[in-house]
Amino acid sequence: MDLTQVLPEKLLADVLRRVAPRGLAACRCACKALLGIIDARRLLRTDLLPHSVAGIFINFHSEGLPEFFARPSTGPTISGRFDYLPPHIGDSQYRGKIEDHCNGLLLLEDYFENYYVVNPATRQWNSLPPHPSMSKSGEIDADFTYQEYLIFDPTVSPHYQVLPPALDELDTVMEESEWPPSVCALHVFSSSSGRWEERSFIRDGEAADTIADMRRHFDKHYAVYCRGALYMHCITDFIMRFSLSNDKCQVIKPPIHGELGECPKLHLGQSEKGVYLASICEMSRLLVWVLDESCGQTNWVLKHNSCIPPILDYDRPILGPWVLQDINYEYLKERKDHTDTEDMKYLKEKKLQLNSSKEVLVEEKIEWDSQNDNILHKEDVVDAHGNGYFDILGFHPYKEIVFLDVSMYRGLAYHLKDSKVQDLGYLYPTTSHLAVLNEYFITESFPYTPC
């Protein structure tokens, strides 16, 4: 039934005002009449979308399941357990990692290279069909890192896309071939068609490097979907901008090397003013740049350059306003073959130490106040340089806040505008007490915004 022919436009608009943003996006795609009503009355306004950060999903190298670091909730719980996904072979539980996040959807990969797109807020999920060969020969060069990225904007469409790096047309035998090639041929997955489709992007401007310079680098490189384009952080720190409206790609050079100094790695993210890059140099100096694309030019503007104060007692197991769900510990505790082992007894002791302040914590307010909660004052920091090291977990997408961890023990929220530091809480997984030291590190982290 065509509701636009049955109901008066004003009445239909009143009905549509009660529809959630993602549902409105679906209505826009249903027919031109609904599209006209929604757009003419500005019913789908991005400023009315939820702008909250529900928590941070974290992949720890030593753990089989992602962890979720978040404020405890009295409502439906968002979890990193993903026990509704197909279980690991020989197990009762899904096991894998999070590859990407975009506007409330997660891209997951299990240990058999099966991919899933998941909405943790609704527990809805879809599996992706196998990816076509990334090379014409059907063989994949082991020296390249293949990461796939998610594209989703609920204000535009209920459908998502998955975009891999531009690798399909590379001749990896030709070490001096330019990277990226003049035509980037990709297989892009579209949820509207349910299949991988060939798509070519024409390079606008010069190449960034040669294939010889693009060999494997194990650090995670993130991507950002912003203003209708995907910004992909590539090896050697240049950014590739894929415009989905005109099928063009462009190389964006990183900040000049003089500014980078001894910065070990850059972290790409999205925040209040668009696309950001951040790096921590000399263990505690935080540098942040914002991408300026005005007047048809691209330029990195240095936004912040300041030292983060060392944190006092950063490794003490004391809970804060945010709590790690400790999914790997709960999973291990449920396994019958681990119930009475010495390792399990040891982990239970560690868990008891951490839970000593939990009852008081749950009684506090649930909504995180990004301005006032758990501000660290002078007595909470130390003067000595090097008391723990800092790493970047991601950006708050709507406020100029960088999420950090201190030696993987505590989470912090660092405000760029006034250098205010908030203690979020203890994020060390209980099961990591059993990990070999060189196996314990964070591989990926994603601030999560539900939709």
Regions found by a protein language model. Name each.
Residues 1-451:
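N-terminal entry/capping and adjacent linker segments that precede and initiate structured domains
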